[in-house]
């Protein structure tokens, strides 16, 4: 009986193992094919001869049809959408024909020769989607610095791959994200098994409020196999009840047909001449309805002109004022588009931010440039902001004249109102660190308790500054700056300083010198030395001082869009006189107009009291940041898919009477906002927490 049971068990186990063994062999064979094909895809771009890819010119045709399925008043808040947010129908079509010149570094320069559009005023709409039309399939990121490509070796940890063999030596490759995240895409491609060349490719994903479906036909020979010859895209945009659908088609590598002198011309005859594919019935109908409408409107305007009637609400308030208040204003000018100007929306709640010290801050930015030739350019910018918590308006106006491109020679004049500042003596007393030299009459912080909490401007000075700098680079490693800087400081409450026998106005005028060293050239660490020497009686100055600062900063870029930002610096005053009352460092100051996630690394301390910036005659600080698209929060279920970047912050500071001060932070970047959470430690003791956020919505639109 026992022997019978043993036979039954043995046969059962053997029967179970046979299909498992066959399945295992089949799976092993499938895995081997997948690994083999993916290795060839990962290596394909490095094996292609790219000779001739630079210094060449080609032409491309793009058409897109847009439909507003649902819309409401909030659509006018979306950049580039104001023109289609009211009236003007529901369907639109745009075509343009571009000249693309690739320089020696492989950077494309695009000039638009023809442009037809039924969008009012030929406005550019959903321009951010056009970035999806030229994906870098074999690169680390698909679209400029966004979306991790499944066909780059460093990103394979984020994808699962499956390969199905097809006839004629081809295979179908599927790539599935291991987690749901806006930095990853679902992918299907037809590839050649022998060398890993991609012939056809489809991507599906979501980024920056847009759901997209992309279908590519890749080039067939040489370096052209690294890019598409045709791209079809469907984009779905949804925002606060608005639903917009777009269909895009771009065809690349077209022959030259028109004169290169054409610049953004609206001509239906020329467009029909270069159009490589026919319009479908729906597209022809959109054009027909549009031109019929324009003809009727022209006749109505002729009648209105005779009757001298003007629709103030429609023509002025809605089209002009509303457009300029809620939409970006940008335009080029000059016969060959030598100049441009751009103004951020004047009134748009999406352009606000928040920080612990300044509360809600509204920001705006204006910039323009004109190029006389490759060497000579002039530019002007206006960057401003208003702090609702401080009830203060900040502005910075830089004007720059570039006169030598090879040596980065430029002359820059900058004017603005800086942070309000206390004298260093008042600042130290407000912080509770009174030194023998700080005697200033009968003043004591106990008279004004609110000073300790930073809630009064009773002792502060307003600051109006001017800065003129000439910059010159000797070679890729060495550069210098030479110029002049002036500060006019006027007491907010002059009567306070009159009472204690101190001046209520100070003016400093100082020559400045800077020396910059880049040991590894353009890419790598930047070391800079700055020296500023205030001279009494120079152009009306009444302060003598000397200040030196050393600064070192670098950003190390790693694979998978990771980066390490580091900045170290020190500064000190070398000369002091009887009226040496202001401590104002160049590289250690309170940033009065904070930017968004992509601002340059400035070494801000989020929770540090503003009094500390001008209480010590020396400082030593270090700031480090680690950034990556997927660290911790991206792996969370449900919400993790919306986190596009994450950061860790570590900042340290040593000043007189505060040794050390540290801040630790964690930041998140989503399509809507950037968030930062910080904890401060004062002399190794917990000193509080805080947060900061800024709107990121449509920042790249």
Give the predicted meaning of each segment.
Residues 24-170, 179-184, 248-346, 350-353, ...:
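Structured extracytoplasmic
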Residues 9-17:
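Bacterial N-terminal signal peptides
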Residues 5, 21-24, 553-555:
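Glycine/threonine-rich ATP-lid/beta-loop region of ATP-binding domains
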Residues 162-267:
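Gly/Pro-enriched, hydrophobic low-complexity segments
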Residues 1-9:
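Bacterial N-terminal signal peptides that target proteins for export
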Residues 62-69, 235-241, 253-262, 416-425, ...:
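Short, conserved secondary-structure transition motifs
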Residues 142-147, 269-701:
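Exposed, low-structure sequence patches enriched in small/polar residues
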């Amino acid at each position: 009986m026992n022997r019978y049971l043993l036979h039954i068990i043995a046969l059962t186990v053997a029967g179970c193992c046979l299909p498992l063994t066959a399945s295992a062999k089949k799976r092993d064979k499938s895995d081997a094919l997948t690994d083999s094909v993916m290795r060839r895809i990962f290596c394909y771009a490095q094996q292609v001869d790219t000779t001739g890819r630079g210094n060449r010119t080609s032409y491309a045709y793009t058409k897109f049809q847009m439909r507003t399925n649902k819309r409401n008043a909030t659509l006018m808040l979306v950049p580039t959408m104001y023109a289609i947010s009211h009236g003007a129908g529901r369907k639109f079509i745009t075509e343009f024909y571009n000249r693309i010149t690739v320089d020696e570094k492989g950077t494309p320069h695009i000039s638009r020769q023809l442009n037809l559009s039924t969008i009012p005023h030929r406005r550019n709409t959903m321009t951010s989607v056009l970035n999806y039309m030229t994906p870098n399939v074999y690169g680390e990121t698909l679209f400029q610095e966004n979306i991790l490509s499944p066909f780059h070796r460093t990103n394979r940890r984020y994808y699962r791959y499956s390969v199905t063999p097809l006839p004629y030596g081809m295979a179908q490759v599927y790539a599935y994200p291991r987690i749901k995240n806006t930095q990853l895409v679902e992918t299907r491609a037809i590839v050649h098994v022998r060398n890993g060349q991609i012939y056809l490719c489809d991507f599906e994903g979501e980024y920056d409020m847009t759901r997209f479906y992309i279908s590519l036909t890749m080039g067939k020979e040489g370096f052209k196999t690294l890019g598409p010859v045709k791209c079809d895209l469907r984009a779905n945009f949804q925002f606060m009840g608005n639903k917009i659908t777009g269909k895009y088609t771009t065809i690349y590598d077209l022959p030259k047909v028109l004169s290169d002198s054409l610049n953004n011309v609206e001509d239906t005859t020329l467009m029909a001449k270069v159009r490589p594919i026919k319009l479908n019935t729906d597209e022809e109908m959109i054009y027909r309805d549009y031109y019929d409408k324009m003809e009727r409107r022209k006749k109505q305007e002729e009648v209105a002109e005779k009757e001298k009637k003007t629709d103030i609400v429609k023509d002025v308030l809605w089209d002009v004022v509303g457009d300029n208040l809620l939409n970006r204003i940008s335009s080029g000018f000059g016969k060959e588009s030598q100049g441009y100007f751009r103004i951020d929306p004047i009134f748009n709640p999406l352009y606000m931010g928040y920080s612990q010290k300044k509360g809600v801050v509204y920001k705006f930015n204006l910039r323009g440039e004109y190029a006389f030739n490759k060497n000579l350019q002039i530019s002007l910018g206006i960057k401003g902001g208003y702090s609702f918590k401080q009830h203060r308006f900040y502005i910075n106006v830089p004007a720059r004249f570039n006169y030598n491109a090879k040596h980065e020679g430029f002359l820059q004049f900058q004017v603005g109102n800086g942070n309000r500042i206390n004298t260093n003596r008042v600042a130290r007393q407000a912080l509770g660190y009174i030194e023998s030299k700080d005697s200033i009459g009968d003043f004591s912080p106990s008279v004004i308790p609110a000073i300790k909490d930073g809630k009064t401007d009773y002792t502060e000075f307003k600051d109006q500054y001017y800065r003129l700098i000439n910059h010159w680079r000797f070679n890729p490693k060495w550069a210098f700056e030479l110029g002049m800087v002036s500060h006019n400081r006027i007491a907010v409450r002059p009567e306070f300083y009159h009472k204690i026998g101190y001046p209520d106005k100070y003016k400093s005028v100082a020559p400045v010198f800077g020396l910059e060293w880049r040991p590894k050239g353009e890419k790598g660490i930047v070391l800079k030395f700055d020296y500023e020497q205030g001279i009494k009686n120079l152009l009306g100055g009444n302060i003598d001082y000397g200040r030196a600062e050393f600064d070192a900063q670098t950003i190390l870029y790693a694979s998978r869009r990771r980066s390490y930002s580091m900045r170290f610096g020190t500064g000190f005053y070398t000369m002091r006189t009887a009226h040496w009352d202001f401590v104002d460092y160049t590289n250690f100051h309170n940033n009065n107009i904070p930017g968004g996630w992509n601002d340059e690394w400035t070494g801000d301390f989020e929770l540090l009291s503003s009094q500390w910036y001008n209480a010590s005659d020396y400082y030593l600080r270090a700031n480090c940041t680690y950034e990556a698209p997927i660290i911790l929060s991206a792996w969370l279920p449900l919400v993790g898919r919306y986190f596009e970047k994450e950061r860790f912050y570590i900042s340290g500071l040593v000043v007189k009477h505060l040794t050390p001060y540290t801040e630790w932070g964690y930041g998140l970047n989503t399509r809507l906002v950037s968030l930062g959470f910080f904890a401060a430690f004062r002399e190794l003791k917990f000193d509080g927490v805080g947060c900061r956020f800024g709107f990121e919505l449509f920042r790249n639109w």
